[in-house]
């Protein structure tokens, strides 16, 4: 398994969602380690907020893609039904 497989699709193209999740995890780990090193009292809140932002971005993109695909399928079915009625 190559390093690039962590954030690309099966065909080798860059995956936006996987990239956001992977680099978000890397950044969150860096923020956590740096905050622990500085001995800050707000580490859990900052870390969880950052992770929610990273996960939320990818999840929102997934929901938008699913709704878009459903809308396209509905349009195609409507066209097919219109052709059958003619």
From Swiss-Prot:
Q: Which Pfam families does this entry report, sorted A to Z?
A: DUF2644
Cell location = Cell membrane
**What's the source species' lineage?**
Bacteria, Pseudomonadati, Pseudomonadota, Gammaproteobacteria, Pasteurellales
An example of a Gene Ontology cellular component annotation for this protein is:
plasma membrane
For this UniProt record, the keywords arranged alphabetically read as follows: Cell membrane, Membrane, Transmembrane, Transmembrane helix
Organism name: Haemophilus influenzae (strain ATCC 51907 / DSM 11121 / KW20 / Rd)
Q: What is its main location?
A: membrane
InterPro entries, alphabetically?
Answer: DUF2644
Give the transmembrane region(s): 20-38, 47-63
Q: What ranges does the record give for the region Disordered, renumbered to this chain?
A: 67-86
Domain of life, per lineage: Bacteria
Tell me the membrane topology, using the record's own terms: Multi-pass membrane protein
Comp. bias regions, Basic and acidic residues: 69-86
Protein name per its UniProtKB record: Uncharacterized protein HI_1495
């Amino acid at each position: 398994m190559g390093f690039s497989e962590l954030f690309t699709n099966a065909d080798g193209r860059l995956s936006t969602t996987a990239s956001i999740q992977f680099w978000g995890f890397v950044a969150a780990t860096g923020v956590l380690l740096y905050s622990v090193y500085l001995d800050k009292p707000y580490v859990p809140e900052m870390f969880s907020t950052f992770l929610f932002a990273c996960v939320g971005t990818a999840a929102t993109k997934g929901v938008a893609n699913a709704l878009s695909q459903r809308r396209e399928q509905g349009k195609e079915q409507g066209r097919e039904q219109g052709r059958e009625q003619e």
